[in-house]
């Protein structure tokens, strides 16, 4: 009887020990923060979140309303990475704010376009028409090049990726260029004759570059939206896992099915 009791106790200890070993081998999910602005970035990260969860990475998606705050959060280490901008915009931030941000890879492109509630064709705009454009220099330069391609203006030779209205050499159509914060462009859209709107804000306003744009950026490849980190974190396994998920099959399929008009397309 005593022997049976000892044996039972021993078995109990062995079971407890085995349970403890199993518990110790369970991998705890690691939380990592990534900052975004809005559509489509937040939705793409939700898809990526499901993918990296399989690798025990818990993605904490933090939405911001300001470009600069997003980059400053990465610089401070509040979040590990952000996903909202293209390389020229990132370079502009680094230059103006003594930043040290780098891109770890292209994800998608969002063509810039000229929209109007009043006119249906570029040729319809009269002299004196007011056209709103983004006021941050990287996107302002994109807008100016688009307006140049559409015949509204001519830019000074060599004006580059950070051109401003000061680089307009000739106002061919005598339009008024009104600089507006990118996030506010959809709001002022009804108050001006036309507006050159960033892809993500156009989407939020229910606009499609291919369907509604009077002039559409022909090649947005230089402005692919990228995943950004502070220099030194490029090889972080969590960053690379998120990048793979954002460039993976599920995200590419979503983009093709959700944005059939090409408003957002996977980067090549």
Curated annotation (Swiss-Prot):
Entry keyword set: Cell membrane, Lipoprotein, Membrane, Palmitate, Signal
A Pfam family hit: Lipoprotein_9
Any Gene Ontology CC annotation: plasma membrane
Residues covalently joined to lipid (N-palmitoyl cysteine): 24
Lineage per the UniProt record: Bacteria, Pseudomonadati, Spirochaetota, Spirochaetia, Spirochaetales
Family: Belongs to the NlpA lipoprotein family.
Disulfide links within the chain: none
Source species of the chain: Treponema pallidum (strain Nichols)
Topological category with respect to the lipid bilayer: Lipid-anchor
InterPro entries found in the cross-reference section: Lipoprotein_NlpA
Signal peptide segment: 1-23
The protein's name: Membrane lipoprotein TpN32
Xref: SUPFAM superfamilies: Periplasmic binding protein-like II (SSF53850)
Compartments in which it is found: Cell membrane
Coiled coil location: none
Residues linked to a lipid group, S-diacylglycerol cysteine type: 24
Record keyword Ion transport present: no
Chief location of this protein within or outside the cell: membrane
